[in-house]
Every structure is written in structure tokens, then in C-alpha cells.
Amino acid sequence: MTGTTLAATYGPISGADLEAELAQPRIADGDAQDAAVYERDGGAHAPPFASGGAPPDGDRADVRRAAGAGDASVRLTRVSKRYGERAVLADVDLSIGRGSFVSIVGRSGCGKSTLLRLVAELETPSAGTLVKRGDGGGALDTRIMYQEARLLPWKTVLQNVMLGLGRRAKDDARAVLDEVGLLARANDWPAQLSGGQRQRVALARALVHRPQLLLLDEPLGALDALTRIEMHALIERLWREHRFTALLVTHDVQEAVALADRVLLIEAGRIAFDQRVPLDRPRARASAAFAALEDRVLQRVLTGSDAAPAAPNAAGPEGASRGRAAPASGLRWAV
């Protein structure tokens, strides 16, 4: 099977998200054939991502303590989003600290992905202000990763990682493939990879740009449990090494607690719950503290009220522990 055959049988590319992510870089790179496909589908008119410098240096513990404080990379003030008469988000106030890892959970249709699309500038707020500030006050370079890897099947793994970049980026692309453990598959086609491997390629494609903000829209939802845990470890390791800000949307409460410094719950278009995660990394999922915190978040999602006891030593907007924590529920999907 050749790349030409794959290109001929793939058909038109659909999905404004993919187009917005890749169209502008591909046009700038001069790949006229691929750019024509994106342009035909309207992708060239989607808002381009801002370019920026490298993520800030500094002590990660200090960065985490500052999450949501003065040094914010993303700030939303009274942001609302409507589609016609339907209000999806209403008066959202949110500050995301530079270098922090924030997870967003909530029931289906609550506005999680809409909030992510606003931060990605794939949508514009109906009201309110959104400010994204990069290192030194410049533009905040932003990349996004979806549940579907969205790889171009007529391009090799290496070529997919290099999308939007010139040929001089080949060494950088190979280096980031090595970081995600797929350098040996650089010349393979996407169809030859497993689902988890395709997501690793998608992650590499985002990280090769050295973003300051990485948005994750349920990127692991279609993977099996063991592959998800492996991907959790990979994402956490790369986050700690590259020091970008991460915003994750997920239905999986355990995933949210395992990865984030802070878990937000969206209900009826508003941030209804803001829970800090004061657990050491890497997270010990079998520990009582992890189980109690997971259960607290899950019960809050399911009941719609902050009635569950706090995790031991949990410090956050909800206050300190209020007694012995209940056992963790076997259910961890907030649907």
C-alpha cells in the first residue's frame, strides 16, 4: 500500500478542529496539495493558533502552588457561550496558573468541550473576556489533542508529526517520536499502528511545536484500561519535563485525579466545584487518600451537591477534611 493510494481513497477531510489545527501551518509550509484540501473544506478560515516562545523555566512546585493565582496563562472573566437561544456556558470565571495541570469533569452536554474550544479559540465567547498570556506577556502557543488521533493516512508517522513544519524540523520530529517511544515506527503508516500508538503520534505532533498550553479533549477515551494507564504516565512525564500548562477534559474521574493539580466540575454551564489535588506524584492510585479524593469528586458529580466528605488533608476551596472518608465507589465515569 502506498501513500498515493491512501490519499486517493481517503476522500475529503472533515472536521473543523483538525483543519484549524493544521491548515495555517501547512499553507505556510507551501504544501499546495494538502493546503488545497483544507482550504476546500473551509479550514483555512479557522482561527490560527498563536505562536510563542518556549515554556517558562522555574521550580515546578512553585508553579503548582501558584496555580490559579497571579501568574495565569489563561483567564476567563464572566464568559458565556450561546448557540441561538441555548445557553451552554454562563458567567464562567476561571484562572489557570502557568505550568499547572487542570482537569474538567461533568456530565455529557454540560459544556466541558465548549469551554475547551473557547480556550483553543476555535469558538468565540458570546459575552465576557478570554485572555491568554504566554511567557513574558507574549502570545500563548496552543495545541490540542482529541479522542481521535486524526492522522493523515497517506503520510508516514514521521510526516504526520512534521505537519505544519518545514523539512528542517525532521530532527525535532524524530526527537519527539523518541520521547513517546515510537522512533522505530517513524516510517510506518498510521494504519499499521494500534490505537494507543496512534495517540502517541498525535501527542508527538502537538509537542513538536513546544506548546505553552496543551489542550486535551478526552484523548484517551477510546483506549483500553492498561493503555490508558500507560498514556497517563507518558503525559505526566512529558508535562513535568516540558513544563507546559495542561487542560484536560475527561469523563473519567480517576483519570482527572491521577493527572491534575486541580479538578473542576461544570454543571449547567457553570463551574460548580473546584477541588485541589494535594497528592504526591506519581499518584498512588491504591492509596486511601487517592480513593477518598476520587470518591469525593465522583459523588459531587453524581449528586449535584457538595455532600461527600473531603479527602484527608485536602486543601482547597472546599475546606479541610470533615471526618472519615467514605470508601471509593467502583464507578468512576462521570457521564
Curated annotation (Swiss-Prot):
The keyword Signal does not apply. Coiled coil: none annotated. It is an enzyme of class 7 (translocase). Its EC number is 7.6.2.14. Keywords: ATP-binding, Cell inner membrane, Cell membrane, Membrane, Nucleotide-binding, Translocase, Transport. It is a peripheral membrane protein. The keyword Nucleotide-binding applies. PROSITE patterns: ABC_TRANSPORTER_1 (PS00211), ABC_TRANSPORTER_2 (PS50893), SSUB (PS51291). Part of the ABC transporter complex SsuABC involved in aliphatic sulfonates import. Responsible for energy coupling to the transport system. PANTHER family: ALIPHATIC SULFONATES IMPORT ATP-BINDING PROTEIN SSUB (PTHR42788:SF17), TAURINE IMPORT ATP-BINDING PROTEIN-RELATED (PTHR42788). This is Aliphatic sulfonates import ATP-binding protein SsuB. It comes from Burkholderia pseudomallei (strain 1710b).
